[in-house]
């Protein structure tokens, strides 16, 4: 089989009226990423020479989103062409012709069909082999709305003669169950010739890309069909209902992959991954957990129910108790080996927990580093802080890190004990082994090993009587 350069053309011009949204259809998200991003990643996996995205409705928004792309397609060469006005699929591909060299194969994909697998497309390209028109097809129980594959005979191996759009099909043609998926591979030199012959003599007065099949037959070029059985691979998104249905398919398949790798999921139907999740051996994930962005879970990590974890690395043996929210955003969050977090804890960007750190219920940590064995077990805030080993941080204590204009750091050295309900006003340093008495407001550095108490002196008034309410008040 000869090797031909591959150019991928992606249809992304449609408005998506049934989505009932101002957002261009191809930018709606599945698995936390735009539909179009999934298609671009697939193109990158095929080692395409370039991807040409045909835009129309919301073109500037689509192009801007592509410019911010990450993942497998980050290094893919990308070009954009506009389809204005939108006069059909054939007209759309005509707009791409000026940037398609004749030495290659053109693979036509849809920007709203996110679950097509690279292996499926590789098989389709092998059928094309630089000299045939190859179509990706599927047999459906209810083919309404799809273009039908018309063959020269009734045998499944019979030569493909035409694709007839549903609105133009006769009753006999509508009885055909094999449909065209919208995906084809065609030698570019032939595509250019056939697109020049298109007309809009049909019910919709549009230029159909599918009409090139009859031109191929007329020219004696073989038209082959690669038929698959997995409908999800060619399922498009045209409504919020279809998007939700496809989201469930995506999540179920991802859950199956995780379990095949050894991850224990309490309920595969109650897992949402909206990015990239990697897991070590013997990871356990309870129900209703959401993973966003890039998340890695080390060996033996346990995630309790109802946790939301985004852009975080959680090391081996750590336990994240239920209802914990971890959001690394751009700075990321690091949780060390054997650490315990939650329940009802919040780790914000820049939180870096060392090994065996304990963060308990209703504790918030932001842009702070906690060394091995440090503990903040309940009702506390640590922001812009550096916390040493074995520090005990009392309930109700906070770092006052913001002066209204700038953030300042608090340094708490090793073996410090911070009593309950303390305020550490940054910038401030608490020396190693020091103790801060409960209820203190600390505004100056505390020497190592010292006891520091910064609060009003307690006064007790003997025989004091509470005020008595006046009648009728």
UniProtKB/Swiss-Prot annotation:
Signal peptide: none annotated. It catalyses: alpha-D-glucosamine 1-phosphate + acetyl-CoA = N-acetyl-alpha-D-glucosamine 1-phosphate + CoA + H(+); N-acetyl-alpha-D-glucosamine 1-phosphate + UTP + H(+) = UDP-N-acetyl-alpha-D-glucosamine + diphosphate. Binds 1 Mg(2+) ion per subunit. Mg(2+) binds at residues 112, 238. Pathway: Nucleotide-sugar biosynthesis; UDP-N-acetyl-alpha-D-glucosamine biosynthesis; N-acetyl-alpha-D-glucosamine 1-phosphate from alpha-D-glucosamine 6-phosphate (route II): step 2/2; Nucleotide-sugar biosynthesis; UDP-N-acetyl-alpha-D-glucosamine biosynthesis; UDP-N-acetyl-alpha-D-glucosamine from N-acetyl-alpha-D-glucosamine 1-phosphate: step 1/1; Bacterial outer membrane biogenesis; LPS lipid A biosynthesis. UDP-N-acetyl-alpha-D-glucosamine binds at residues 25, 83, 88-89, 110-112, 147, 165, 238, 348, 366, 381, 392. Its main location: cytoplasm. GO terms for biological process: cell morphogenesis; cell wall organization; lipid A biosynthetic process; peptidoglycan biosynthetic process; regulation of cell shape; UDP-N-acetylglucosamine biosynthetic process. Keywords: Acyltransferase, Cell shape, Cell wall biogenesis/degradation, Cytoplasm, Magnesium, Metal-binding, Multifunctional enzyme, Nucleotidyltransferase, Peptidoglycan synthesis, Repeat, Transferase. Residues 1-240 are annotated as: Pyrophosphorylase. Homotrimer. This is Bifunctional protein GlmU. The lineage of its organism: Bacteria, Pseudomonadati, Pseudomonadota, Betaproteobacteria, Burkholderiales. The gene is glmU.
